[in-house]
Structures are given as C-alpha cells and as structure tokens.
C-alpha cells in the first residue's frame, strides 16, 4: 500500500473497514468466554470472571500506551522517509512490551488476591477469579507484545494483516474454549489458557511478518537498544489512550 501517493478516500476505506471489523471481532472475546464459562462452569464462575475485567482493561491500557504511541511515531517517520528511525521504533516496541508486560504480570500476581477483594470478590468467587487471572497474568507479556505489534503492523501499511491477527485470536479462542472447558474439564482455567494460546499463535504470525526482510519494517540486529527520545515520545503520545482506558 502506497501511503504517500494513494488517494485519501481510498486509504480511509482501506484502514477504516479492517479496523471496524477487528474491533467488532475483538468485542466478541469476553462474550465467548462468558458463554462457555457460564454453561461449562456455572454462575459463580461468571461472577469471578467479571471481577477480572478491570485488571484486563488495565493490561489493555498498558498495551495502548506503547502500541498507540509507537504506531503514531512509525507513521510519522515513514511519512518523512526516515526508515532507520522507524526500524528502531519497532525494536523499542519489542523491548518496552517485554519490560512492561513482565513487570505488570509479576507485580499483579504478587498482589492478586488483595486486588480482587478490592474489586468486590467474595470467598465464593475469589477462587474462580484467581484461577482465571493467574493464567492471564503469566501470559501478560504475550498480550502486550501482540497488541503493540498489531498497532505497528497497521501503521506500517498492513491494516488487513492487523485485522487478520485479531480475527485469528478470536477464532482460535472460540475453538479452544469448549475443547478445554468441556473436553479436558479444565473449567475457567481452560478459558484463560485458550485466550493465551490464541494470542501466542497470533504473535507467531506477527513475528513471521516482521521477520521478512522484504518488509519495510522488519526485525534485524541493532534496533533493540532503548533510545531515550523514542521511549519518551512513545509514552507521551500513548498516555492519552492509556488514561482513557
């Protein structure tokens, strides 16, 4: 896609339609989990799942902090034909998501029970919430990486591929949920494992795209060292969507 020469109206459609489809598919994520958990585990498990939503939103907010900021900077640098800086932004996204994803996951795991009780957990629901969220938090770095790379993928001129990554996670999650909950009898933990595995598979697909040296932005040596200016700009731009989440 020629971002610098294509007609604005055509670009708007090519970006807006995949984004709308991806957002619609993404909204089905928690709905699918809720349906299978409700039928396979019970009403208390649904209550436990609901307790995890604030933490899930916070994790997504940190993903937006890096993803939106990086995507904006990548778009600007590509428009300026500053491909070297755009490459370094990609590398910094990987490192930032590793740091934030691991830190958030481990820190929240340490204080998980007090946090869940703060959100209204009872003795009847804390077990379900803990069982689900502990798996999600161990895979939190995958979530951050997946969200960050998807934002950069879209900014690099591949809105359809970013949409496909989202649809892939939702579809795999919907397939694995009944298998793990009903087939293997893993209960609410099975739903969490399905979510993490779906994101891992999407992340593998993203890595394959960014490993292609024919891509304008691709993984290579020398781009993973954090640059203060890049990090500050990413966080400054991403702060607004972070706070909105």
Language-model regions, residue ranges each:
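Interfacial helix-capping/hinge residues at the ends of transmembrane alpha-helices
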Residues: 34, 71-72, 112-113, 147-150, ...
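Structural signal for membrane-spanning alpha-helices in multi-pass inner-membrane proteins
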Residues: 108, 151, 177, 181, ...
């Amino acid at each position: 896609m020629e971002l610098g020469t294509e007609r604005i109206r055509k670009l708007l459609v090519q970006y807006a339609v995949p984004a709308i489809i991806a957002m619609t598919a993404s909204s089905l994520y928690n709905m699918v989990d809720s349906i299978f958990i409700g039928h396979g585990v019970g009403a208390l498990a649904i209550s436990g799942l609901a307790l995890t939503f604030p933490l899930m939103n916070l994790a997504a907010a940190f993903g937006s902090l890096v993803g939106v900021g990086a995507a904006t900077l990548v778009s600007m640098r590509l428009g300026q034909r500053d491909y070297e800086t755009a490459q370094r932004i990609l590398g910094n996204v990987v490192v930032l998501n590793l740091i934030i994803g691991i830190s958030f996951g481990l820190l929240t795991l340490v204080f998980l029970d007090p946090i869940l009780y703060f959100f209204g957990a009872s003795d009847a629901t804390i077990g379900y919430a803990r069982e689900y969220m502990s798996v999600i938090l161990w895979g939190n770095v995958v979530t951050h990486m997946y969200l960050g790379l998807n934002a950069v993928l879209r900014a690099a001129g591949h809105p359809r591929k970013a949409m496909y990554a989202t649809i892939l996670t939702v579809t795999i999650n919907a397939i694995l949920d009944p298998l793990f909950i009903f087939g293997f009898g893993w209960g609410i933990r099975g739903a969490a494992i399905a979510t993490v595995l779906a994101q891992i598979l999407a992340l593998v697909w993203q890595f394959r795209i960014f490993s292609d040296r024919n891509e304008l932005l691709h993984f290579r040596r020398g781009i993973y060292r954090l640059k203060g200016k890049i990090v500050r700009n990413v966080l400054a731009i991403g702060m607004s969507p972070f706070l909105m989440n």
